Amino acid sequence: MSDKSDLKAELERKKQRLAQIREEKKRKEEERKKKEADMQQKKEPVQDDSDLDRKRRETEALLQSIGISPEPPLVPTPMSPSSKSVSTPSDAGSQDSGDLGPLTRTLQWDTDPSVLQLQSDSELGRRLHKLGVSKVTQVDFLPREVVSYSKETQTPLATHQSEEDEEDEEMVEPKIGHDSELENQEKKQETKEAPPRELTEEEKQQILHSEEFLIFFDRTIRVIERALAEDSDIFFDYSGRELEEKDGDVQAGANLSFNRQFYDEHWSKHRVVTCMDWSLQYPELMVASYSNNEDAPHEPDGVALVWNMKFKKTTPEYVFHCQSSVMSVCFARFHPNLVVGGTYSGQIVLWDNRSHRRTPVQRTPLSAAAHTHPVYCVNVVGTQNAHNLITVSTDGKMCSWSLDMLSTPQESMELVYNKSKPVAVTGMAFPTGDVNNFVVGSEEGTVYTACRHGSKAGIGEVFEGHQGPVTGINCHMAVGPIDFSHLFVTSSFDWTVKLWTTKHNKPLYSFEDNADYVYDVMWSPVHPALFACVDGMGRLDLWNLNSDTEVPTASVAIEGASALNRVRWAQGGKEVAVGDSEGRIWIYDVGELAVPHNDEWTRFARTLVEIRANRADSEEEGAVELAA
């Protein structure tokens, strides 16, 4: 109450001070107006006199210009502006004495001051003059232009304020605003409503666990994270001057540059990145699957995290998990909300980001009709109106599923070589635009072609060349004027990457620049001669076959030298993502190296011709050595 009374007292004192200032200002304004009125009255006769003198001088000058010299006694200075007749000094003397002679004359002014008339008094008579004929010369004179710069004739009289008044106003204005603010605060305090009722702990828990609150919180927390984590560089120079000034940088995009890292302290720690995939519908989204965390037995074994490249937040967009390690994962093509995972137990799980649950919305049964071994390959193939989920497990079983029903597979097939040996599949790839034929890599190091339908359904050709298990396989993806869809690359534990064609069962070329297991390989989606591979020493290599086939075109080693398990190109081909054995995902910008020129396809065709010629020469030399 004391604070409120002090506030009111302070307000009253300010109001009194404000009233005093206003009265003082009003009094000064009245005095100023009174002074101006007095000065105006004093200036008026002087102004009239000065105008009359000016007109008189103009008249004299006009008379002199035409040869008339006014007599000195006829140019007396008028005493007042209202006077119509002015007496000469001699006349004044005669008038004082009372003698009114016949020669008395007066200078009389017309209503128009510019016209001068000499008249004699009618009562006193007129002196007789001798008249004669004279020549009259008529001359016209333009009136003199009079320009007045007086404030009185152009703008209203300016009001001059004293410095004291200005200081008073400067002092009053903020006080007025402060007083009004205090009044508003006082009114708000008086009209303040009663505080809302405090909720009980039971009511709070009921709200926190309600489905509506969970959905709202799950949706809005992502928006807030995006806003808080955004740190765009407002000083970025698009002209490239900063890149030119840096020492050691040849050109922007000549080398791999680190963009960002995805890592969650809770869900990524002590887990291995097993698979990654980019979304076709939302290119900024990437999903990654993780193995189990042996240090956290109570946590779910399988985890899939959806990361967002568009926003600079450090947490995943979505967190999904299941009870078995997720060995493979992909976005369901034509279904942007669905994520498919293949688990170590053999189950196929399906997550939906429209559901606020983190567990799968669908899963396949653990039965002989489906998979019972680890599933390392999941892929959605087909078109918008006719597509299927294709999965392959390490026991050689391939299943085709409908995403609407995962209870039973639509069709299944045993991938068996020579009708007796099941193929332990570790990788699968479909050529671009093909949904029937595919290639698979196996644990024995052999590569096979296979077919889903037709008379030759099952395992077809055999490609031998690797000396260890095949860890990665990928078909050529870049679409251009020349079709290279028959090409594919494989990586293996034998420290090599091999280039193959489905038209020949021997490798076209073997890239042997690595000194550790090569865990994955992938073609660029836009450049015909570019592919990326990763190895167990934490090294990412980019090979541009149009530039060199002996050493990588660009290479980078990640911090800590953790083994890199997976590599995936973004859809635009400008970024490449790699996952390591510590649960971290590294994003690198490829830059201009990934942009193909118009002649890249023809150059790559010539490169393939040279590779085939060199392989033929080496085979001939080998045959000669064997014969010798």
UniProtKB/Swiss-Prot annotation:
Modified residues (Phosphoserine): 50, 83, 90, 94, 97, 162, 180, 618
Modified residues (N-acetylserine): 2
Ranges of Polar residues composition bias in the record: 105-114
Main location: cytoplasm
Impact upon substituting residue 154 to A: Abolishes interaction with DYNLL2
Cellular compartments annotated: Cytoplasm; Chromosome, Centromere, Kinetochore; Cytoplasm, Cytoskeleton, Spindle pole
Name used for this protein in its record: Cytoplasmic dynein 1 intermediate chain 1
Gene name for this UniProt entry: Dync1i1
